[in-house]
Amino acid sequence: MLTPIITNQNLFGKMIVYRNLNIKKKHKGSVIAIGNFDGIHTGHQKVLKEAKQKAKSKKLKFGLVTFEPVPTMFFNKNVKNHRVNSLNQKISFLQKIKLDFLVIINFNKAFSNMSAENFIKKVLYKELKSEYVFISQNFKFGKKRLGNIKILKNFEKKYLYKSIVTIPQKNKNQIVSSSLIRKIIYKGRVQEVKKLLGRPWCVEGEVIRGDQRGRKIGFPTCNIKLNSYTLPKLGVYLVQVKIDNLKKRGIANIGYRPTFNGKSLLLEVNIFGIK
């Protein structure tokens, strides 16, 4: 499955996706959650649930402000395998929880140099006219990540919003975070990742044509480019594959193309029952 082309404004079900801050009037004065939300793990889900409940109680619209690319990948050009999920997966998950709208801010050089107060003033106040702003406890924003909970609280009266901090979600006395999940993925502990995400971890990618050698030895595989995903420990995994509406089990190898004797890192999947 490929990431959809998202223009200035797209409709995904009943959820509108904005790629700039030209926000419709009906979405101004809403309840807003802010963050990278990479993986949309159980901690993120807690933030979204509380924000959604507030929106319902106040009869307001509910939206999320997030960033693309993930800031870590913007600041570290050499970091290629960092994401827990793709933008397409993020959009799909948010659509399922019935978000009213999603704002994807282009994280570029100009935006990275915006001060914390300017972010509050220009994005939360002028463009969104936010009524309530929900964040996780460790969220940082603005130039050099100087914006934090204290800064957000300090500007509440000036910019006419109320900020609400969600208590962190914990698992075995550890705060659930995207960075923790990446570390666990690196170690290949995918069942543990499932608990932190609240669902199985999955990847999507373009199937590329190989040399057909696996087919010749009776072990045909789909070769999938993983792009910017966090890569698990090299090895063999039992997987479930979804192709359109068809679900199949299979076995996958993440490594250096064992059936091809090559050196490039690849995900190869043998899907049971498909020749």
Walk through the language-model features, giving the residues of each.
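Phosphate/ribose-recognition catalytic cores of enzymes acting on nucleotide-derived substrates
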Residues: 208-275
